[in-house]
Amino acid sequence: MIPGKKLVLAALAALSVSLLHVSLLHAQTAATDSGKLRGATVNNIESFKGVPFAAPPVGDLRWRAPQPVKPWTGTRAATAYSADCMQVPFPSDAAPLGTTPSEDCLYLNVWRPAGTHPGDKLPVMFWIYGGGFVNGGSSPAVYDGSKFAAKGIVFVSANYRLGRFGFFAFPELTRENPDGMLGNYAFMDQIAALQWVRRNIAAFGGDPSNVTVFGESAGGFSVHMLLTSPLAQGLFVRAIVESGGGRGNLGGQRYVSTALPHGPASAESIGVEFAKSMGIQGTGKAALEALRKLPAEKVRGNLNMATMAQPGYAGPMIDGHVVLADPQAAYLAGNSWPVPVLLGTNSLDIGFGFQPSKDALFAGFGPYRQQAMQAYDPTGNAPLAAVRYAVNMDRFMVEPARFVATVYASQNQPAYIYRFSYVAQSMRKQWPGAPHATEIPYVFDTVQAKYGKDLAPQDEAMAQAMLNYWVAFAKTGDPSTGNPVAWPRFTPETNMVMDFTPNNGPVAETDPWKARLDVTAAIVSSAPPAPAPPARPASPARR
């Protein structure tokens, strides 16, 4: 070859590599309202991790509403998860953390298809993790958003404060926050992250007017909060609740300052007792300052999912500003955002109970005792443990999901119900049904991360099916779109559910548990509603 031509070809090759490099760099960057970010590309998916959506909630910002991020100059690396929120990791967590927890934790993550540009207006999905409000984070491998991005979704996951960092009340906090932005800091974090999405997701190619929120367990309960909070107005257009209850019985809610007769203590009184346990007396400014100076480990204590039912921790509360009422009261009053909803539970979901006998168990149904016996134990020969679990699971998880779907269907909003009955091939000798949270790696199609060498082709097929339904719902509001098995809308008349079965894939059917849920609904609906919380002055959200 002529030397001159070699030089030209070499120059062209170098230019091509340079242009490719520039193109990749451009594709891996995004400009937010706080500064520029540089992400990473893996398998044709771009991710931006550890993106701050609020100032670190430390020091004087402990127990305050999320505050604006301090802008940065230059381009910030966004290639690794930032710390999950402060907690004592739970050894048998279904979603083990990938970071060391820290109080400085208000960060989110974004995945998108490679080559996505600002203005592409891809649908957005916003994930809220579970963990009983004391555990969880956005770093677990099973929460990786890559498979959603591969389906044309801009996927977002965000941290929120946990334990006493996320839920805490104290008399001086009430005095210094007359606008009512107190107590439920975890929910404020979720709203702040959604507001960040509204302001910034277009820079990542997402459509801020097409956001679907979804969460599991405590994350699902959080979705109920968002559906019924005035501060979440307009931040999303669809919602998915996985094993998140739907009445007032999941979050253990209480009021900030008021203790109800025969009800739980006020959150403030719990905060005062916690302060005393730390050697801090009084309820004024000096006491609050001392509380804010406590080491994070002291505030955290030993709280996790195994120890959360202990004195000194309030959990979610009704504050009259962020959370106006428990979900059941809000839904029955018509105080929820009119959006399509998809809800469901697992076939062996949470159902713990302590009734010592069948007589005690069925006595709890009052005048519906006979109907309950016929629905749950028609032969009278079922083991107590199995019947007790089914009764408590239905009351805690399954019937509340149907209740919410019924409310939305009555408002002519699309509502869809699922039951996840599939059990991984490697776990079938151990699990008689699908336990709580086991649907997550199928929804995310991260079964490889969950089961590794024990993964079977059937597991992968179910994961692909569930992912496709969730994506279809996020894109169109109808999970049937593009899927081989139609998912009928739920109505009280048809009671149709989509069962992700152990052996037959997705099956749409009339709910075989209808009689169980009907009798459970009869006793739950007859319970007196919770009274309204004390009034607080209305004010606009800070962010």
Residue spans for each PLM region:
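Positively charged n-region of N-terminal signal peptides that target proteins for export
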Residues: 1-6, 397
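Bacterial N-terminal signal peptides
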Residues: 10-23
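Serine-hydrolase-like catalytic core of hydrolytic proteins
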Residues: 90-281, 321-325, 329-356, 410-413, ...
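Substrate-gating cap/lid region and adjacent catalytic-acid/histidine neighborhood
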Residues: 238, 250-251, 256, 286-458, ...
